[in-house]
Structure formats: structure tokens, C-alpha cells
Amino acid sequence: MDAQDIRRAFLDLLAADGHAIVARAPIVLRDDPTTLFTGSGMQPLLPYLLGADHPDGARLADVQPCLRAQDMDEVGDNRHTTFFEMLGNWSLGDYEKAEQIPRLFRFLVDTVGLDPNRIYVSCFIGDPEHGIPRDEESAAIWERLFTERGVSADRIDLDTEEYGNEHGSQGARIAFYGHKNWWSRFGGPDEMPAGDPGGPDSEVFYYFPQVEHDPAFGRYPHQNSDGGQYLEIGNSVFMTYRKTEDGGFAELPRHNVDFGGGLERIAAASIDSPDVYRISLVWPIVQALEEVSGKSYDDYTESMRVVADHVRGAAFLAADGVKPGNSKQGYVMRRLVRRALRFGLDLELTAGVAADLVPVVGRLYADVYPEVAAQEAAIVAVLQKEEKQFARTLRKGLSLLRRLNRQGETVTGAHLFELHDTFGMPLELSLEEAARKEYPLAEDWRESFDTLMQAQQTRSRAAV
């Protein structure tokens, strides 16, 4: 199945199971001061998960476009994107694990066509200190589902990611973790404030035997390792508990279920590819890059991933009315466009890529998110303006870094400030470039940079 078919099939399945298909939220949350973007499917539904009644009932589903700016520096590997779509379904006090887990398993195996022998899961190991039991119910349901398909369902207790890195999952189908399988808005049970809800979760992973485990992420692979063999494709949260004033936990009167599954990752699993950039919603953008650059994805993998992802994300932000700027959503958009331009230079695309790629993005999403295609000319104009403003100064800034390296100089805070102040290069981009090219940084670069920045701000205030 391609990604478009998976999106449609998910909503059809949930609707047939009595879920109301709710309208998606915008990516840009203008009335939420706590966050810049919608970063998960549950985010717009949080008031209802915390107890409010939803006007459409207790069984809900949607597909939510999301943007996570915090993943920007991770883009370039085979699994991270800033923009993605989240398949979501929720029960507000209606059903629990006994309905959620089997339906998810059937969707992945019978609808999407994933091999059950390559599906692995995780469950909550329990927290005796807080009186929270081990999630045997979820594990037992998973064990039954696997056994019915003739798949082994061994268990292993790993508790922490660090322990898993040292010992591996040893082929066990069901791995028990601690904080990795606990959901709350604030982290583990210790970090939660009194009155806040939380609960165990059960993650689903797809195993790629053709990928060699990266030992940089531990000696042995396991479900929650970033070593490359296991790709998380979904997570069911069972919001069951409320933290009490005395630091303990009590059961909520209404148990909720919150499922989120990454469309791009499920689609990658469906074509047996550990690379999410090869799915039907992203690969045409890569192909357009290959055509305009005359270079191949296999030779310029990281650069093409960054450009494809960042232009896609920037196009959706522009469709939501964001323009590049120096604060909040505008700053994130500026970073996306400028990073795309920087990595585009690796492909010898010196004039930017917006005009070539935005129409492709618009066509890919025209059936479900028509606003990109409808505003194509305006979006291209917004992105091209930023590209043109930054292209010349970017080349000069990169030239300065190369010259310093040729002369054997260490990159200092003063150099980084010059790149920021004179050439308009964001500090993050300069640091990233130095790391990519292994240019040495002065030990006191941060202190020096901050001193110069504060002095500039003082001069600016005095001039007003």
C-alpha cells in the first residue's frame, strides 16, 4: 500500500468501528502560548483527554499534519522528518486495551500488509515505588495476537534504554521498559505534578533485518534502540492514573486511550524500506531534486533528505500564513529555508529550490490538504524571497569558514559572531557546518559569542 492508501484505509477502519472523524487542527497554533506548532495528533484534543466532553462523542479519529522543529537537526538520517502526518484514534472513557490493541494489530497486518514476524512491541515494566503495576494486560493481549498468527511471543525485561543497549532484546517479541513506556505531559512519574494524568503505553516497532545495527547506539539492538534495525511506527497510550497530593497515584474515573501512528513510517514498513524518504509522499520530491540537480539520491542522500523535508515543511507553514522572521514560527521557517539552501549547495543548486519543489508538494497533498496547491504561487514567492536574501551571504559565510580552516585557525566566538552579524548566518547553522566539516572550535566560543551579542544589544538599545 502507498501512503495515500494507508491514510484512507485507517480512517475507513475507524469510521466503521464507530469513530467520528474529526477535523484536523492547523499546524500553527495561534491560540496556544505553550507551543509553536501542532506536534502530535493528541495535542488539539488534550482538553478532552483531561476530562472535557467532546461534541462528537467518545470515539474519535483523524489524520493530523504535524511539525516538530526540535527534530530539525536529526533530519538527514533515514527516519526523521520535521513535517509528518500522525494517524490518531482516541477513546474518551469508551474502550480500553482489549479493543485498541487487537484493532491496531489487524490494521497493520491485515490492512497494511505488514509481516507479523517483523512486528515487535514494548510494554510498561511497572513502578513499585509509586504503586503502579506492570502492564501484564497489554502484554497478554499481544502474546495472544502473535500466537494466533504462529509468531513467537517471548518476553524480556529491559527497564532502561541503557540496559537494553548493553544486553539487547535477544529476539524477544515483547520488551518491558520503565520510563520509555510511561506517558505524561511532564515525563516520568516523579516529574508529574499533583493532579496530572498519565499512564502506561505500548509501542509498536517494525524490524528491518537488512539493516546492520549501528554500535554507536549500544552493543546490541533492542526495540527502543536508535541503532537502525527497529523503527517505531505507533504508540497506544492508556491514560489510567492521576497523581495525588501525597505523591502516589490513583485510578482515573474515566480511562482514556490515545493512539498515534506515524504515516510515513508505517508506509516505509509497508514497502520494506527503512528509509522514509522512499515512500510515495516523499520520493517524488527527491526525484524532482535528482532531475534539477543532475545528481543521484544514492550519492547525495543526506543533502537530498534535508532539502526535501525542509521545503515540504516550509511550504505547509507558508500555507498556514507563516513568513520567515526572527522569532517564534517565523524563525523556525527561516531556519528551514536556510538549511535547505545550505544543503542545496551540495547539489550545486545555488539559486534555491522552492520554484521546483513546491509544485510537487502541492500535487502530492492536493486531495487532502489542497491549500498548498491552491496557494502555490504565493508560497513560492515567500520562500524565494528568503532564498534570494540569504544565498549571497551564505556563500560568503561558508567561504569565511573554509578560509579559516585552510589557515589552520580555530573557529572562535568572534568568528561565529561575525558570521551571524555580518553574513546573517544563524548560530546553529554555523555550528552545524563546523561540525560537518570537522572545523575545530575554541573552548570559550560560547562565552565570547555571548559577550559580543550582549554588547551589540546594548548598543542597539542606546541608539533607540
What annotation goes with each model-predicted range?
Residues 1-310, 315-335, 343-353, 358, ...:
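Structured aminoacyl-transfer and RNA-binding surfaces used for tRNA recognition/handling
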Residues 250-253, 297-302, 320-321, 384, ...:
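Active-site-adjacent structural elements in folded domains
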Residues 285-288, 310, 357-360, 364, ...:
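Short acidic/histidine-centered micro-motifs embedded in hydrophobic/aromatic stretches
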Residues 293, 297, 369-387:
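Long, non-coiled-coil amphipathic alpha-helical linker/lever segments
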Residues 340:
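Aromatic/basic-lined ligand-recognition segments
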Residues 344-351, 387-464:
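Extended, domain-scale alpha-helical bundle/helix-rich regions
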Residues 349-378:
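Cytochrome P450 heme-thiolate monooxygenase catalytic core
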